[in-house]
Amino acid sequence: AWMRAPYEPQEGQPADYRGYGTMTDEAVRDANRKARERKMQLLAHCNGDGACGQYLDCWEQAAEEERTEREKRAGGRTPGNDRPVMIHAQLLGLDQLARLKALGMIPSFFLAHVYHWGEDHVRNFGWERASRISPAGSALALGIPFTLHQDSPVIRPDMLETLWCAVNRLTRDGRILGKEERIPVWDALRAVTANGAWQYFEEEEKGTISPGKRADFALLSADPLKTPPENLRDIRVLATVKDGERIWGDGI
């Protein structure tokens, strides 16, 4: 992860080691420019707050270019209409959230990191920074819509484990990593349903079970809203339905 401040001391690395970027600023700006010209949504993989800052800088420049262009013509698209996505946003700084919101950018958090590698983050970045990884609670407080993902095949595609991670934020050692970043079950469910559809411009046909929308849903062994938070990952998927047809399971 490319960081703004150095890692905790790392064997074989200088004391000021911060990781490094994989793209130049110009390459990021060029990708942004091409995406906007072709009216394509842009999603960028950003782990450290250094990479997050580079992506935000790119979009802030795009926003300024759009404002200048709108002075020359009426109407037009804005960066917010493009719904750019920041994938992982693992070590996104809390001070960067306001910038992200102003741009209409969507963070998609790989929140299972808290359980699978939370203790590694503590060793690499110290407790304070590690406790802020995947800051879903702070994003929620600011009214920023976000989604959750598993990054399969890095880990298995288990959405219920991800819900459990978002609500409890327990590491493998059983420690709560970032109590203030935990979110309610309802908001975790929205992050993987309605917000997911909205992220990909599909909110008119997916994301909620509503009249006129596609009948895409999963049948679970228990109601997540009535299940003790510590037991969320024990809920089983009994069946999945797509366009009204059962495609997996025999629960219905």
Located regions from the model:
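His/Asp/Glu-enriched, well-ordered alpha-helical/loop segment
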Residues: R33-L43, G50-P84, A89, L94-K226, ...
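Glycine- and charge-enriched low-complexity intrinsically disordered segments
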Residues: G249-I252
